[in-house]
């Protein structure tokens, strides 16, 4: 496992991960719904993940959610690059009851996020617009091109969980070892 910490006036975060793990997790962000999503992300990506966060959640969850995405993304990039002997591209359509979310991604070292999941409101006390903030912070710092698209769904919890699982499975597929591909780019570098 490798680790990274970040401390600001708003948050104090430590993240450890192993991209070649078994999907074990120990998550304590101070944001219960995010803990649930990150546990699911770890399980379905097979990335071992430990996260602790103490944040100013008495204000709201925004700083904690975004800063966790920043630290997790930066640590993921540290573990991943340079990409070699991996598939590089990954896709997943994840169904959770009535909800279906797709994720297509490229371990390109070029960050870009397309997020077409139009949600408003809350799941419990969790503001649903924070999901986009998390993924934007993660993708920009992980330096991956990622498209997350809601195909259908009504239940906010199901939609968000399907999104986290779709990203997780797409990452697992993109990180699949393939010794034949070498550096998976015609540029011979990523």
Curated annotation (Swiss-Prot):
Membrane spanning residue stretches: none
Keywords (A to Z) from UniProt: Amino-acid biosynthesis, Cytoplasm, Histidine biosynthesis, Lyase
Record pathway: Amino-acid biosynthesis; L-histidine biosynthesis; L-histidine from 5-phospho-alpha-D-ribose 1-diphosphate: step 6/9
Subcellular location: Cytoplasm
EC number: 4.2.1.19
Sequence similarity: Belongs to the imidazoleglycerol-phosphate dehydratase family.
Catalytic activity: D-erythro-1-(imidazol-4-yl)glycerol 3-phosphate = 3-(imidazol-4-yl)-2-oxopropyl phosphate + H2O
CDD domains hit by this protein: IGPD
PANTHER family the record matches: IMIDAZOLEGLYCEROL-PHOSPHATE DEHYDRATASE, IMIDAZOLEGLYCEROL-PHOSPHATE DEHYDRATASE HIS7
HAMAP family: HisB (MF_00076)
Record GO cellular component, one term: cytoplasm
Primary location recorded for the protein, binned into one broad class: cytoplasm
Protein name stated in the entry: Imidazoleglycerol-phosphate dehydratase
An individual GO BP term: L-histidine biosynthetic process
One Pfam assignment: IGPD
UniProt GO molecular function: imidazoleglycerol-phosphate dehydratase activity
